[in-house]
Amino acid sequence: MVRQVKKSSLKKNKKVAANGVVHIQSTFNNTIVTLSTLEGDTVAWASSGAIGFKGAKKGTPFAAQIAAEKATKEAISQGMKKAEVLINGPGSGRETAIRALQAAGLEITLIRDITPVPHNGCRPPKKLRV
């Protein structure tokens, strides 16, 4: 169904603290999930595009779910147990990514939406016709 993209990089399996932060950047076109320590050092990350989805499929909730599962499994293998979740963006993969984090075994302590909302700033782009 989805072709896996192989990466040839050396990864250090360093143990990290049990607490961390999950950043979910969800746009209309892609979803990026980054797990980091409380200090901000990246532990694991995954995106819909890096998983192997292409084009419009990157923006789907299913692609966000797979990306969240992959990043969470990698972080749990390095010792992370609990995490705060910071969600940014208007995309369709927001809730699905959170459910995937919980299903993968990560205990969520806090969910915070940090999507920037203008106080009537710049004119937005034209309405999307779906």
From Swiss-Prot:
Pfam families: Ribosomal_S11. The keyword Chloroplast applies. GO terms for molecular function: rRNA binding; structural constituent of ribosome. It is found in: Plastid, Chloroplast. It comes from the Eukaryota. Keywords: Chloroplast, Plastid, Ribonucleoprotein, Ribosomal protein, RNA-binding, rRNA-binding. GO terms for cellular component: chloroplast; ribonucleoprotein complex; ribosome. InterPro entries: Ribosomal_uS11 (IPR001971), Ribosomal_uS11_bac-type (IPR019981), Ribosomal_uS11_CS (IPR018102), Ribosomal_uS11_sf (IPR036967). GO terms for biological process: translation. The keyword RNA-binding applies. Part of the 30S ribosomal subunit. Belongs to the universal ribosomal protein uS11 family. This is Small ribosomal subunit protein uS11c. The gene is rps11.
